[in-house]
Amino acid sequence: MKIYILGAGAIGSLVGGLLANVGEDVTLIGRGRHIEAINKRGLMIEGLTNLKINTKATTSIPGAKPDLIILTTKSYSTDDALNSAKDIVRDTWVLSLQNGIGNEEKIMELGGRPIGGITTNGAVLKEPGVVEWRGRGITLIGLYPKGRNEFVEEVKETFNRAGLETEVTENIIGWKWAKTIVNSAINPIGAILEVKNGAIKDNDYLLSIAVEVVKEGCKIALQNGIKFDISPMELLIQTLEQTRENYNSMLQDIWRGKRTEIDFINGKIIEYAKLVNLEAPLNFLLWALVKAKESLGGGSK
């Protein structure tokens, strides 16, 4: 399968590297120093495995269309990434493995064929050309917004062959919403207070806030016609327990002085609330506090 990874950061490089390792025709599309290092020394994957992979890597969009584009940019970079690749997006399958909601709609706007995805694999970019695979997880993909398709099944088989445990759902929009609702509670609370995820579960005050945020998100989702295959409340508790030693990605972005994805998590829930004439006061409060923290120059590290 000819695959382009659009936004080859940590997760994109991990997925692309593992696919290239089993013989798929992969091109990583990313930024300067990382791509330069891969072209010089190959892509190194450390942590749960130890691989050196020689794969194509470039900072520009190739002219030839692939079978699949895997979109792994931050959600705030989706527009720029898709517009730069618009000539190859039209009529091409595009799998979004991104946080938040709304990315697949942007793929559709440019005539792409969207596949939604969520993954619990954990990866960090240690240095240019080197990815550390920190947590083995599950990837869930599906025809967006709903349904089944033979190509999606083929992608699942390809991922599994590469060592990425992957399943297909007929309701990927429900899963994307469930994950976003959980992230809307965990990420801003952890980012504002600069605590590990486990502290949210162990502290009665923080857990009660997280539970109310999830309830608010569920109400908004249901009014927008979203159906869940898993209870977001169950997913909240499960995620807090499984990631209790983690500082979430939003907090890490703040510590690094980088923009967070708050606009595409809590911000999107606020947008969808307005569409059905609902209020989202808890999501608004968390969104505003994180935006304030960003503008004040980040956290204590």
Swiss-Prot record:
Q: Which Gene3D superfamilies would you find in this protein's record? A: N-(1-d-carboxylethyl)-l-norvaline Dehydrogenase, domain 2 (1.10.1040.10), NAD(P)-binding Rossmann-like Domain (3.40.50.720)
Q: Which GO terms describe its biological process?
A: coenzyme A biosynthetic process; pantothenate biosynthetic process
Give the subcellular location.
Cytoplasm
Q: Which GO terms describe its cellular component?
A: cytoplasm
Keyword flag Oxidoreductase: yes
Q: What are the annotated disulfide bridges?
A: none
Residues that, per the record, bind NADP(+): 7-12, 74, 99, 123, 261
Which keywords does the record carry?
Coenzyme A biosynthesis, Cytoplasm, NAD, NADP, Oxidoreductase
Query: Which transformation does this protein catalyse, written as a reaction?
Result: (R)-pantoate + NAD(+) = 2-dehydropantoate + NADH + H(+); (R)-pantoate + NADP(+) = 2-dehydropantoate + NADPH + H(+)
A Pfam family per the record = ApbA_C
Principal EC category: oxidoreductase
List GO molecular-function terms, semicolon-separated. Answer: 2-dehydropantoate 2-reductase activity; NADP binding
Q: In which pathway does it act?
A: Cofactor biosynthesis; coenzyme A biosynthesis
Q: Which InterPro entries match?
A: 6-PGluconate_DH-like_C_sf, 6PGD_dom2, ApbA, Ketopantoate_reductase, KPA_reductase, KPR_N, NAD(P)-bd_dom_sf
Q: Which residues bind substrate?
A: 179, 183, 187, 197, 246-249
User: So what EC number does this one have?
Assistant: 1.1.1.169
Establish whether keyword Cytoplasm is in the entry.
yes
So where's the catalytic machinery, residue-wise? 179 (proton donor)
Q: Which PANTHER family match?
A: 2-DEHYDROPANTOATE 2-REDUCTASE, 2-DEHYDROPANTOATE 2-REDUCTASE-RELATED
Give the similarity note.
Answer: Belongs to the ketopantoate reductase family.
Primary role: Catalyzes the NAD(P)H-dependent reduction of ketopantoate into pantoic acid.
What's the protein called, per UniProt? 2-dehydropantoate 2-reductase
Species name:
Pyrococcus horikoshii (strain ATCC 700860 / DSM 12428 / JCM 9974 / NBRC 100139 / OT-3)
